[in-house]
Amino acid sequence: MLISSRGRYALRVMIDLAEHNDGAYLPMKEVAQRQDISLKYLERILPILVSAKLIEGIHGKGGGYRLTKKPEEYRIRDILRLTEGDLAPVACLECGADACHRTAECRTLPLWVELNRRVNEYLDSVTIADLMR
């Protein structure tokens, strides 16, 4: 499991919106400058977050983006699954994966199952509020 730039940037954007949350919409340009992320890249990430209703956005004068919930209500796992897809460490544990023909004899499967469980459990336990500290 390697978290892509999209996943890392999505977390940075969510933290930025949380840290500057006064109820107003924050212009994308300001977020991009503070986070040193290109506007072009943000234009690909923000719609994903909006469509999942993690943030809301308004176009035009006075527009921008803001959180839809309190920072402590956003679990990191949800954001990363949205931007990364399945977080399984190996293909045979991905959601909807066909059963591997070696499952019955695979000596490493218990390792991957436990790693997957621990990673997901940890990411479920961390919120945006935790990352603001």
Report residues per predicted region.
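N-terminal helix-turn-helix DNA-binding core of bacterial DNA-binding proteins
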Residues: I3-S5, Y9-I37
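Alpha-helical residues within the helix-turn-helix
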Residues: Q33, V50-S51
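Key DNA-contact positions within bacterial/archaeal DNA-binding proteins
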Residues: K40
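Short, hydrophobic-biased segments on the C-terminal half of alpha helices
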Residues: L46-P47
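Residue cluster at the C-terminal edge of the helix-turn-helix DNA-binding motif
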Residues: S51-L54, L82
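Beta-hairpin "wing" of winged helix-turn-helix
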Residues: L54-L67
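Non-DNA-binding regulatory cores of transcription-related proteins
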Residues: T68-R133
